[in-house]
Amino acid sequence: MAADHYVYVLSCADETLYTGYTTNVERRVAEHDAGEGAKYTRGRTPVELVHTERFDSKSAAMQREHEIKSLSRAKKERLVADETG
């Protein structure tokens, strides 16, 4: 059975947004909160999961991660708002 692949966006304590890739969102968010995630999120805890997208392949997820990381902050905020509102 193939694993699901996810792209996620976190809202950090300093109000910045972090985008990442994982196969287990719950575990990865916990790692970020524990200071064991990406260097970027260390010292910016606690983090809040504000957006996720699921993909069937790692390549599709990684491509989407790159797309989101390339967005302006305003466009990232709209992406998050579309999911929450």
UniProtKB/Swiss-Prot annotation:
Q: What are the residue boundaries of the GIY-YIG domain, all occurrences included?
A: 3-78
Fetch the SUPFAM superfamilies from UniProt.
GIY-YIG endonuclease
Composition-biased stretches, type Basic and acidic residues, lie in 58-70
Q: Highest taxon of the source?
A: Archaea
Ranges for the region named Disordered are: 58-85
Q: Which InterPro entries match?
A: GIY-YIG_endonuc (IPR000305), GIY-YIG_endonuc_sf (IPR035901), UPF0213_domain (IPR050190)
Q: Which CDD domains match?
A: GIY-YIG_UPF0213
Family the entry assigns: Belongs to the UPF0213 family.
Q: What is this protein called?
A: UPF0213 protein NP_0776A
- Which organism is the protein's source? Natronomonas pharaonis (strain ATCC 35678 / DSM 2160 / CIP 103997 / JCM 8858 / NBRC 14720 / NCIMB 2260 / Gabara)
